[in-house]
Amino acid sequence: MSNIIKQLEQEQMKQDVPSFRPGDTVEVKVWVVEGSKKRLQAFEGVVIAIRNRGLHSAFTVRKISNGEGVERVFQTHSPVVDSIAVKRRGAVRKAKLYYLRERTGKSARIKERLN
């Protein structure tokens, strides 16, 4: 029974997901429904956490909008997520960057990874 579930989950997983890590700046394009209209909305920010669970994988993106911190959790293989583009690679040494929540301005910057 477990093999059947794994096989079904494997079929539903997206194959075109780029590799990114915490600290990377990504742009996620999401389908938004407003009334009868359907359009793409971009959300660009720093990946602060990744949760790898196969089909149920998710990642958290944080950005500053109008001086207010905004975090959004995206399901990696969701049909609502249209595309993920890596804009900048960040050099960090932690898997979860929750410490960025308390930081603002220059102290919240992340160095760029060269390789």
Swiss-Prot record:
The keyword Cell inner membrane does not apply. Keywords: Ribonucleoprotein, Ribosomal protein. GO terms for molecular function: structural constituent of ribosome. GO terms for cellular component: cytosolic large ribosomal subunit. SUPFAM superfamilies: Translation proteins SH3-like domain. The keyword Ribonucleoprotein applies. Gene3D superfamilies: 2.30.30.790. PANTHER family: LARGE RIBOSOMAL SUBUNIT PROTEIN BL19M, RIBOSOMAL PROTEIN L19. Belongs to the bacterial ribosomal protein bL19 family. This is Large ribosomal subunit protein bL19. It comes from Cronobacter sakazakii (strain ATCC BAA-894) (Enterobacter sakazakii). The gene is rplS.
